[in-house]
Amino acid sequence: MNACNSQMLGCFVPGHHCIDNAIHSFAGLQVRRDMLEIMNKQGHEEPNGQVKVSSGYNLPAKYIFHTVGPIYSGMHRDETDLASCYYSCLRKADEMKLDSIVFCSLSTGIFGFPIEKASRIAIKCVNSYLKEENKNIKKVIFDVFSDSDYETYRKNMKEFNY
């Protein structure tokens, strides 16, 4: 999953250390072209909590799921929007009959969502979806930014017996 901005065209800061920049850089220019076409057809910026899909191109993945997470403000709406991102991606993966999905730690970088809170939301959404709605997904991977993020996810996953 690519955590992206509302333009969905990749990070516009050269050399920026965000997941959006990394994915667009390594996947290739075709991703930006595809996303530009999708966004031109849509005619407006992408709101939080939805998902668009492109080919993975040069990445070792068939598809890239692009979603806009919330910029953290401390409001309850942030949590709802973050959950919507995860549920939208899970539903789309299931609809596409994919058996696995990889999530980054959405909104916890430059968007400022506290990792403790964000990881609980991510794990709760995945756990709920797999138990209640899932038809095809067999593997979910959380790809995190740092060792401390890893420890936070690991600790919080124990609450769900993972």
Regions found by a protein language model. Give the residues of each.
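Macrodomain-like recognition of ADP-ribose-binding/processing modules
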Residues: N2-Y162
